[in-house]
Amino acid sequence: MLRWTVHLEGGPRRVNHAAVAVGHRVYSFGGYCSGEDYETLRQIDVHIFNAVSLRWTKLPPVRPAVRGQAPVVPYMRYGHSTVLIDDTVFLWGGRNDTEGACNVLYAFDVNTHKWSTPRVSGTVPGARDGHSACVLGKIMYIFGGYEQLADCFSNDIHKLDTSTMTWTLVCTKGNPARWRDFHSATMLGNHMYVFGGRADRFGPFHSNNEIYCNRIRVFDTRTEAWLDCPHTPVLPEGRRSHSAFGYNGELYIFGGYNARLNRHFHDLWKFNPGSFTWKKIEPKGKGPCPRRRQCCCIVGDKIVLFGGTSPSPEEGLGDEFDLIDHSDLHILDFSPSLKTLCKLAVIQYSLDQSCLPHDIRWELNAMTTNSNISRPIVSSHG
């Protein structure tokens, strides 16, 4: 029984950020917020959410080891990707309005909170943003995105073997997925499932004739072939800047945006790779408002969703509107315990808590007390 159980405000106000779950913590890297200064080059920020205490903290800036020498830290960016392999977060790609796109690989040690730039070899992908990254064993797969130097969408697959730090351009077989950016790619078993994103009628070139495909594409990492997939009778609307995650061998997507429909989404869909069918899921409880560019991470049997941007309630739902960046966080519980359901009842009906054990009262307080690290809200146009 899926249920939205927690809704808190006051976290990092971020859009197009990237995040990974490490145990009961979620590490969020970069992104942007309307109204902030992005002309000045600065270090990427790192926020950590504790899924037990339900509190956010922000890591302090990295100080240079040698005075006068800049520390090895990625610059602030958006549209990048992060993956976790063992105790290391690998951050790749993304762009900044001053520096442009980047193709330097950064490694973040979750134990020491130190950054490094591993020495890599092979065919390094061109700098880009809006790509996807997913992991199979020690290998990170990069697909798609918008390449800065070529000034076009990509449908290439690159893989990085982190045991040898070698990049390879994968020579794929079969009919490849269309060029796109701000899609999702999720690894289930040995298969990478690509959904959504923004494509163009003119193939790799951006002409503002956008396409939002809602067919799922599957890449087999063993044969390095794009598979021919059957058509499905029920499909979610095509979208970009949505979230996707795998749980118990199935693929879920949430939210996103379709410019041709002038619509933001807050729907949840489940894809079963065995039957190759989609099903719309209606969780209990109050979920997030329609949005795009948010982050989703799996922590145990829970999904932690935070940030993103939505049209202002005073505006229409078209592509020309004021956007409001979010500092909220929502938790979707796949199997809420009886204890969790009881706490939700206490909150919903404002029941007396004085007779409850101290630890339960502490948990109730955490579930209802907002964080306080977000910036004041600023709306942006576009």
From Swiss-Prot:
One of the record's GO cellular component terms: Cul2-RING ubiquitin ligase complex
InterPro entries per UniProt: Kelch-typ_b-propeller, KLHDC3-like
Kelch repeats: 25-77, 88-138, 139-189, 191-249, 251-301
Alphabetized GO MF terms: chromatin binding; ubiquitin-like ligase-substrate adaptor activity
Tissue: Expressed specifically in testis, particularly in pachytene spermatocytes.
Subcellular compartments: Cytoplasm
Disulfide bond keyword on record: no
Pathway membership, UniProt: Protein modification; protein ubiquitination
Record's keyword terms, sorted: Cytoplasm, Kelch repeat, Meiosis, Repeat, Ubl conjugation pathway
Lineage top rank: taxon: Eukaryota
Principal location: cytoplasm
UniProt-listed GO biological process terms: meiotic cell cycle; proteasome-mediated ubiquitin-dependent protein catabolic process; protein ubiquitination
Role of this protein: Substrate-recognition component of a Cul2-RING (CRL2) E3 ubiquitin-protein ligase complex of the DesCEND (destruction via C-end degrons) pathway, which recognizes a C-degron located at the extreme C terminus of target proteins, leading to their ubiquitination and degradation. The C-degron recognized by the DesCEND pathway is usually a motif of less than ten residues and can be present in full-length proteins, truncated proteins or proteolytically cleaved forms.
Subunit note: Component of a CRL2(KLHDC3) complex, also named ECS(KLHDC3) complex, composed of CUL2, Elongin BC (ELOB and ELOC), RBX1 and substrate-specific adapter KLHDC3. May form oligomers as a KLHDC3-ELOB-ELOC complex; this interaction is likely autoinhibitory for the E3 ligase complex.
The protein's name in its UniProt record: Kelch domain-containing protein 3
Organism of this sequence: Mus musculus
